[in-house]
Amino acid sequence: LERAARAGIPGYVVARKDFASNREMTIALVDKLRELNIGLVVLAGFLHILTGEMVAAFPNAILNVHPALIPSFCGAGYYGLHVHEAALAYGVKLTGATVHFVNEEPDGGPIVLQKAVEILEGDTPEVLQRRVMEQAEWHILPQAVSLFCEGRLRVEGRIVHIL
């Protein structure tokens, strides 16, 4: 919010703690986004599961960045450091990040972009998390947003075509 304010972009808060349920928060969020005539919702570090109301209001217009190469280490319970802990515990040699459209299944929407990151000997979850952010997430999320805003993404079922 501070960065947006410095750039002259208005910011609004719809806080989960202000609502009795996740559904109520999501409905309030949808109402605010519609009021502002928002065409794209970007989730980055958003750790709440959105309910069907949000997905229905913004079909193929919600982008999420996930810190793994979906379909690995994704879905319920796989967020933040948990993702990197799981990748290290499994012994995979590559991880990375995925930008995908949000649907009603956690981390289950059509994949827009992915970028791989090598796991190095001695990595900790914290070190790996930072490297995935720097080498993958921070590159592919703005790229996906640009593609969307340029009208260069076409979704057919699970497949996202880049035009």
What would you call each of these model-derived segments?
Residues 1-163:
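One-carbon transfer enzymes
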